[in-house]
Amino acid sequence: MEKTFTFRKKNSRNYNIGEAHIKSTYNNIIITLTNKKGDVIAWSSAGKMGFKGSKKNTPYAAQITAEDVAEKGLNAGIKKLKVIVKGPGAGRDAAIRALVNKNLILLVIKDITPIPHNGCRPPKKRRI
């Protein structure tokens, strides 16, 4: 008697609302797309997109990175986003604009950049 195998289709999750965490530092930009619980759906960074050195923290690199994440999010079924921005880098606004241009609806833009209440002493100024 032959055994028959049945293959089940993988359960492809279809999300509607997601969160885009944009971490923009002076050296790089990292964008992570999560669902409401915080499980990672997709991520990308300027270094992953092929930018090297000081080109990683440019608005253009942020735009390309955000477009890559938005494409993956649209494939996962995300239509609406909450954007959480962290850090002082140059590509923050360009990344948000790129997400809007990919026909994603932004619900909230929240800035959670950590600001010290006179915490540690900063490093000395560079003399060039």
Curated annotation (Swiss-Prot):
Keywords: Ribonucleoprotein, Ribosomal protein, RNA-binding, rRNA-binding. The keyword Ribosomal protein applies. GO terms for biological process: translation. GO terms for molecular function: rRNA binding; structural constituent of ribosome. One of its GO terms (cellular component) is ribonucleoprotein complex. Gene3D superfamilies: Ribosomal protein S11. It comes from the Bacteria. The keyword Glycoprotein does not apply. Located on the platform of the 30S subunit, it bridges several disparate RNA helices of the 16S rRNA. Forms part of the Shine-Dalgarno cleft in the 70S ribosome. Part of the 30S ribosomal subunit. Interacts with proteins S7 and S18. Binds to IF-3. Belongs to the universal ribosomal protein uS11 family. PANTHER family: 40S RIBOSOMAL PROTEIN S14/30S RIBOSOMAL PROTEIN S11. This is Small ribosomal subunit protein uS11. It comes from Karelsulcia muelleri (strain GWSS) (Sulcia muelleri). The lineage of its organism: Bacteria, Pseudomonadati, Bacteroidota, Flavobacteriia, Flavobacteriales.
